[in-house]
A protein has these predicted regions:
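Short loop/turn microsegments at loop-to-beta-strand junctions
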Residues: 6-7, 49-50, 103-105
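Vicinal oxygen chelate
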Residues: 11, 15, 25, 56-60, ...
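Core segments of cupin and vicinal oxygen chelate
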Residues: 9-58
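A generic structural micro-feature
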Residues: 44-50, 70-72, 133
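A charge-rich, low-complexity, intrinsically flexible signal that marks solvent-exposed coils, linkers
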Residues: 41-43, 74, 157-158
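C-terminal cap/linker of serine protease catalytic domains
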Residues: 132-158
């Protein structure tokens, strides 16, 4: 059964390539359907890949090849909770190493401009602790691109 709510992501013309990358990068992710355009349209021609149905960590998504009219921005991002540094590094390196760019505080962009927050649970736990622990962890996070869990835990301890 199709979900009632699906995230639709607009791509210029690379939705299928992006969906395959996400499926290969994240667990519980797969490309579930590819649909060709039944006729010419402003972003392409009949027979081109128009939409791609896929999941990212179980979240249903639809990639739409709509042409260059709209770009992704930081106003929308996927936040990926990681359990340890190895998982954090794996996701970060996959995204940045495949033509993406680093940002600050655990944020990065993939080669299609989609924003990702690679967020260790150790960081969210530290921020939720409140008080001095949260302040020190927050200040440490503000100096980082990719989150360093050992540095966050050291800052949390003071």
């Amino acid at each position: 059964m199709k979900p009632k709510n699906t995230i639709c992501l607009w791509f210029d013309k690379d939705a299928h390539e992006a969906a395959r990358f996400y499926a290969a990068t994240f667990a519980d992710s797969e490309v579930t359907a590819v649909h060709a355009a039944p006729a010419d349209y402003p972003g392409g021609k009949k027979g081109d890949v128009l939409t791609v149905e896929f999941t990212i960590l179980g979240i249903p998504c639809l990639g739409l090849n709509g042409g260059p009219a709209f770009r992704h921005s930081e106003a929308f991002s996927f936040q990926i909770a990681t359990e340890n540094q190895e998982e954090t590094d794996r996701y970060w390196n996959a995204i940045v190493g495949n033509g993406g760019t680093e940002s600050q505080c655990g944020w990065c962009k993939d080669r299609w401009g989609l924003s990702w927050q690679i967020t260790p649970r150790a960081l969210t736990d530290a921020l939720a602790a409140g008080g001095g622990e949260a302040k020190r962890a927050f200040e440490a996070m503000m100096t980082m691109k990719k989150i360093d869990i050992a540095a966050i835990e050291a800052a949390r301890r003071g």
